[in-house]
């Protein structure tokens, strides 16, 4: 079992209602609101002790990461966050830890205009900690970008730098590309978009697969974080940048208006999800059901 297969299974297990524009499989679900020109975006994400943060990490840092990685999903759809539900489960959970964690969540939410409207707290039978945030946001009709909408000839573009997120501390200090997501969502030149959490290669391949296309990387154009190799950039994950498929006819104007956007490859006709232009790799992108090295 891997994440991709599990997701495909879930698509068949859970039927969708007519108002669901996008169900399982993208950065957020998308719901049509009767009588409104806005779309409702829903996402949920976790921070698990020992998986997403090291044991003993400060509660404020955990809180910031939890909020920001959810905001990154909203950004990837071209929307803005609005309301959140918070769940905490752990053993042990001290009053001091919970107080610092909740204050950290509030500060992070306030930064992005999010109102926490409820949640739950529970113990665990064994030592550990799981923090979950469900986030609701909104996007304008026509500004939502799906990962499955890349077209042949589109350029693979991305914000920011890649690689060595854990070693550099970026996975705790990153800022979700919210304003960039709104900007890119409004551009007709952007056909598809998603955030990068499991590794640039794995997530870009997902976009190609969902779009029924192959992907050709131009690795010499991938912006590298300090000390990172091309392999690190392709495989490390936890970058929380945005990648998008851009119409080549509009790419120059888009990159001029948004200098932080780099061209890293292109989508082409071919076996869906196949990738060329990359070196031999020893690493793999992140998968919760496999050993990650």
Regions found by a protein language model. Give the residues of each.
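Residue-level signal for inorganic ion chemistry
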Residues: 30, 70, 78, 116, ...
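Small-aliphatic-rich amphipathic alpha-helix that forms the alpha element of a beta-alpha
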Residues: 59-83, 100-111, 179, 183, ...
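Helix N-cap motif at beta-to-alpha junctions
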Residues: 245-251
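Acidic, Ser/Thr/Pro-rich beta/coil linker or hinge segments at domain junctions
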Residues: 255-293
């Amino acid at each position: 079992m891997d994440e991709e297969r599990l997701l495909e299974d879930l698509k068949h297990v859970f039927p969708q209602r007519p108002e669901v524009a996008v169900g399982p499989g993208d950065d957020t679900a998308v719901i049509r609101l009767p009588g409104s020109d806005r779309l409702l975006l829903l996402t949920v994400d976790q921070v698990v002790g020992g998986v997403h943060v090291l044991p003993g990490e400060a509660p404020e840092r955990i809180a910031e990461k939890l909020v920001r990685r959810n905001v990154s999903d909203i950004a990837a759809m071209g929307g803005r966050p609005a309301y959140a539900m918070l769940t905490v489960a752990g053993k042990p959970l001290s009053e001091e830890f919970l107080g610092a964690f909740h204050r950290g969540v509030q500060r992070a939410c306030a930064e992005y205009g999010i109102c926490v409207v409820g949640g739950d707290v529970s113990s665990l039978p064994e030592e550990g900690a799981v923090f979950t945030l469900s986030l609701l946001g909104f996007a304008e009709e026509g500004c939502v970008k799906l990962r499955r909408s890349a077209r042949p000839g589109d350029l693979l573009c991305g914000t920011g730098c890649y690689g060595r997120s854990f070693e550099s501390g970026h996975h705790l200090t990153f800022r979700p590309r919210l304003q960039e997501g709104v900007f890119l969502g409004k551009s007709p030149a952007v056909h598809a978009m998603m955030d990068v959490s499991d590794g640039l290669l794995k997530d870009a391949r997902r976009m190609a697969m969902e779009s029924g296309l192959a992907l050709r990387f131009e690795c010499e154009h991938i912006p590298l974080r300090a000390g990172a190799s091309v392999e690190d950039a392709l495989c490390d994950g936890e970058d929380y940048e945005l990648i998008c498929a851009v119409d080549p006819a509009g790419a120059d104007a888009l990159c001029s208006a948004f200098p932080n956007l780099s061209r890293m490859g292109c989508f082409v006709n071919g076996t869906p999800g196949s990738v060329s232009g990359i070196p031999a790799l020893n690493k793999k992108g992140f998968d919760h059901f496999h050993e990650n090295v």
